[in-house]
Amino acid sequence: MASSISRNGGFCGALQRAPPPMPPGLARRLSSRECYGVGKVKVMLRVSDRAPDKDSPLDPEFMALDKKKRQVTLTDPRNVCPPPQAAQERGPMVAAPKMFAFDNLFTAEDKQSDVCASALSEVIPAVLEGSDGCLLAMGYPSTGQPHTVLGGDVATGAGAGAATGTGTGTGSVAACSLGAAPCAIAWLYKGIQERRQKSGARFSVRVSAVGVSATKPDALSTDLLISHAAESDDSPGIYLRDDFLGGPTELRAPTAERAALFLDSALAGRLKSSGSTSTPAGGGPAPLESALIFTLHVYQYSLSRKGGVAGGRSRLHIIDLGGCANRSGGLPLSGIGNILLAILSGQRHPPHKDHPLTPLLKDCLAPITCHVAIVAHVLHEQSYQDALSTIQIASRIHRLRRRKHRVPMPLAVGLAQGLSGGGGSSAGSGADPSSSEISADTVIYMGPNDDATDGEHPPVYLPSLSAGDNRAIMSKALKGSGLEKPPTQMKAGLSSPMMMKKAMAAAGEKVKKLPGNSPMGSLKRQAAAGACSSPLVPHEQQQQQQQIAHGSPIPIPRHMVSKGSNVPSPKGSPLRRAHAGAHPGAALEQLEAGMRKITEEQWIDGPRVSRAKVAEARHLMREVNHVKQCETWVDGPKSLSCRSLTAGNLPAAGAQTQGYGFMDSHKKTMIRQWVETQTSQVFQSPATVSASNSPTALHWKLSQLKQKSLDLPERPAFPPEQQSMDLPQQCFESQPLLGQDMSLPPDGDEDQDSGPSEVPPALPLFDDPLGSRDISHDSLHRMLSRHVSREQLHEADLVASRASSSHHQHQHHRPSSQRSIDCGLQVTEEEIARTMAREQEHSMHPLSALSHCDNLSFVSSFNMACESFSECGERARHQFDQLARLHEIFTSQLAMAEVTPSAALFRTDVSSVFSEPVFRFNVGQSSVCSEPAYRLTPSPPKQPSHSPSQGSLPSLNGIMEIAGMDDYALLRQPDGASDPSLPKSEKRFAPQHDDICELDEKAMAAAVGKRNSLEDAQHKLNEITNILPLAAQSRLPLLPLNTSSEAYDSGHDSNSTPRTSKHSGISRRAESGYHSVATVRDSDESSFASGMSKGQRHRITISGGGGGGCGAGGGGSATGNYQRHSHGVGGHKKHRHRHEGNGGGNKGLCNWLLTPFSCTYPETEGEISDF
């Protein structure tokens, strides 16, 4: 019934000229800054018209209002009896009047400002505090909803513009008749201005408006401010989406007048979407207005004290459902009520989800922090059924204040605010613990079917007030108090999953035995008895504490309750106990003792042990006979935990009732008999040290000595001079905690912290406790030195047992404990190269003794990354960078072998060079190991010669002797260490190495220039091979070498040397002709050639596994992926060696490289793979 002026707008001018004054209640709330955490629902009823004349008999009154009680009474007019009839004469089917109460009740006599102040008093402060707020007007069409939301003079039916005297149809609405929407705009901006002045926070307000058709449920929501989107500046959402949840247009509104202007524009767009812009002239019904959702988005932020930024967004929704609740295509009012009930109660899937109004309402009302004010509208003139349905829906929403929200609560302060809310609010007070949205697990309470609970949580029972002892602890039984929460000691005791399972299983078995008719009585009495009962036997007391902690109503068995006990029986009363009246102070003392018991830490299987005692016993626990001062028993006496259990400290028979854990007298007797039996067995054995050093035997004896100490109280004490000398050698090793010792059974199981050192014979005990002995620093030092010496002797014996018989002649030159010293920093590789060229008259190299060091137990720290890959060469490192000098020796020797074969060469090992194992390691650039270390190992099984050319290859010993490097073979150790006493030779190494990665044009000339010394080299080779035995020669692996007539193999011959990729693991030296067999390093430079000049170095071509080249002679086809071609000794002899290479056997090297750990019979061919 509002005027067309108020529906068309004009609120911008009204707020400019006469803004509505802020109500005093709202001003107080804004100044107090209350915390609005949890949202509330406030439901009000407004009767928009005046009551009809009571004298009219045709239209009897069915609605009675009581503003004082805020109550409305509805009476069915069909059941209204005439005045002459009495109430007792009504028929039995006549219904009684229905009464409904609300948070507030308004009639036509109430001012518009009072209605707006009551509706917005909690919504606006909540928005300024960061929560959402919503004002919703609901009812059937033409019941006064536009009047409440927008304003107007309903009584006169004339426009507010005429009342102001302006006479224009577009004049502003009078200030006294402004609705909730313009008042909310004015009061919100006024509150923002005050908040900005007080706190310094910054605010930004944006406006959006959405309309929903009342008669077209399939139509989409309409953005009513889309026409202003292009004109607005800095609009964050300028694109219109299909639905409201995607985001409507938000227009910036820096002032209240600007926001009111947007409200006027939204109202104009609402009328257009409804299909009519004016009231119909003919007396037909007015068109149904579409629903309006006008939203003020408040963005605020402020700087905190610590320099951070705090803020966020809150929204104020003003919703006018208009004519949506109609019976001509729209939702009925009952459907809207069901949607509101589902959203406000926290349901995820409200009904009528296909209607465009449903997602809009859910977006506005669903947040838990949203404060909702609902104004239901009825009229006296409407039918009884319509008024009843409207009031019933509003009453159902109003009763939701006693229901709890089913959505998680974001702020903890909101719960406190919700619990302390006033009586006028009707929202839930906290989060519902039964909601599945709070946690991932859904908890279903299967409790008793009684009136104490609504099925959502276990009942909270109060102790009986008739019991005198229970009155003092009644407050503790309230919800959230100490008795409802589990005690702290039960958290410590039941922290492990195994203990929780056992306790729950025991509780479940006892719950099954409960009678079904008394589910509450024993719980009440036991909750009272848990705090005031006397301490029981520890086993029974722990069971009782577990029952109380789990909340299971388990009665105490009668056989566990004595007459003198304070534990109440199921039929007993605290007032009937013997000690209740005789000793009034005894109950208090017992209560205090019980509370002390509760506060202390309780162990399930033994007494408590503090960390201080553990730290104190670390250096005294490992005595010779393993006697511990504070020995902890798994089931031992708690009262003797701080004393020694040796030498007559065992508890007497009368002290068993003092608390002996789970062990009764029978079990104690059995253990004592077992100790005696074990002690007698120990004494029958000789008292000498066992020759075996196995840990099992040692620890078994230690366990016997440990048990022997429990049954020898009559032994004499030791002389005092022996006390400080017999500390064990094990006391400086790591000790386990007492908790680990407690887990061991009292038999001879192994102790994990015992070392390999010897154990002295058993010593008698002395009566005085170990803590009284004086332990000086000298005695500790002597004990430590004895322990170290014993460990060294033990290690030396183990090393000596592993050494071979050929190395025993060097044992007398070394001390008893062998320690390796890394000398790689003192001896450079350049010095090693100079030493290689020294004179031959030196009979013994200073480092030759280091080649017989199989018993070195430590590896150099410079090559710790190089691990052993097989047993036969676990410390060997093959590196052919130092053998570059042998190139010309090989070429000359093989050239002479073609012309005048020597008998000495044929006396070498007949086994193929490819049957010898060659090892490959990844040696880094920082390694000092630049040459191989050859270990004298037994020769592998000899393989039959597969070609005549295999026997013509010289052995490595002969090659080394020819090159003058007989001492160099013994230079390097398996761990890469060198002798620091290596003398510096001034004689330079004449034939220098060449850079591996360069091409040297002078190699040919250097090779031809040195051909004149071949006869001398041949003579020396014959002498060495005659002197050395065949077995010694066969121990060193033979090297497959590529003998080429050229001094440099460029690798460009595609038939012999395939090119590798740029990123291949073989590296560039494989491409340039330098092929290391299986030990090529991934680095591009040699550590030996790093200090040499590039102009004087010569190349060498050594066939290997990395480069893809072929071996000499018979080694060509033995390499799996190699090309089956080889370079001959001369260019004219290439064809001659090619058929030898093809027929030279296919076994040995490649198969070993493929499987270096299990190559016993190298019969097959394999591929070479990079590590």
UniProtKB/Swiss-Prot annotation:
GO biological process assignments: microtubule-based movement
Biased composition (Polar residues): 1043-1059
Keyword Cytoplasm recorded: yes
Keyword Zinc attached: no
The entry's keywords: ATP-binding, Cytoplasm, Cytoskeleton, Microtubule, Motor protein, Nucleotide-binding
Family per similarity comment: Belongs to the TRAFAC class myosin-kinesin ATPase superfamily. Kinesin family. KIF26 subfamily.
One GO location term (cellular component): microtubule
Single Gene Ontology MF annotation: ATP binding
UniProt name for this protein: Kinesin-like protein GA13060
Species name: Drosophila pseudoobscura pseudoobscura (Fruit fly)
Chief location bin: cytoplasm
Segments of this protein annotated with the region Disordered: 1-24, 737-774, 798-820, 932-955, 1043-1099, 1124-1143
PANTHER family the record matches: KINESIN-LIKE PROTEIN CG14535 (PTHR21608:SF7)
Record field: compositional bias (Basic residues): 805-816, 1124-1139
Intracellular or extracellular location(s): Cytoplasm, Cytoskeleton
Domain Kinesin motor residue range list: 40-400
